[in-house]
A protein has these predicted regions:
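Basic, Lys/Arg-enriched alpha-helical interface segments
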Residues: 1-68, 82-83, 95-117
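Short, hydrophobic/aromatic-rich beta-strand segments within well-structured domains
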Residues: 58, 73-81, 85-91
């Protein structure tokens, strides 16, 4: 039985994060590709972020350019909009940034919804 394919969409914030991080971490696209493949296969890895009102998940991604394991890796945050549509919200290096504020994630979703009715 085939798994339903999920449409994974990188929001502008996520794309900007990639452009910034790729300058320092050349293998970032290879590092996140397995996660994107999991999402496209309908899996929802990571921990749900509480207190936002949206089904948002945060997970650790190993940074192969940084030999500190997952704790020195990236945090990828995505929004499970529907069962067949996932939005990649943001991506950051844990060694360069603390946790993202829940309100910022909500703002990213609402800004995208306003500009794409």
């Amino acid at each position: 039985m085939d798994n339903p394919s999920v449409n994974v969409i990188a929001l502008p914030t996520f794309t900007r994060n990639i452009r910034t991080l790729i300058k320092k971490y050349r293998n970032i696209l290879n590092d996140i590709q397995p996660i994107v493949a999991q999402l496209e296969n309908g899996e929802t890895p990571g921990d749900r972020v509480a207190g936002i009102g949206y089904p948002i998940f945060k997970l650790r991604v190993k940074n192969s350019d940084n030999q500190k394991g997952k704790s020195g890796g990236y945090r990828l945050i995505y929004y499970l909009k529907t069962n067949d549509q996932i939005f990649l919200l943001t991506l950051y290096s844990k060694s360069e940034q603390d946790d993202v504020v829940a309100g910022d994630l909500k703002d990213i979703i609402e800004e995208y919804a306003r500009s794409n009715p």
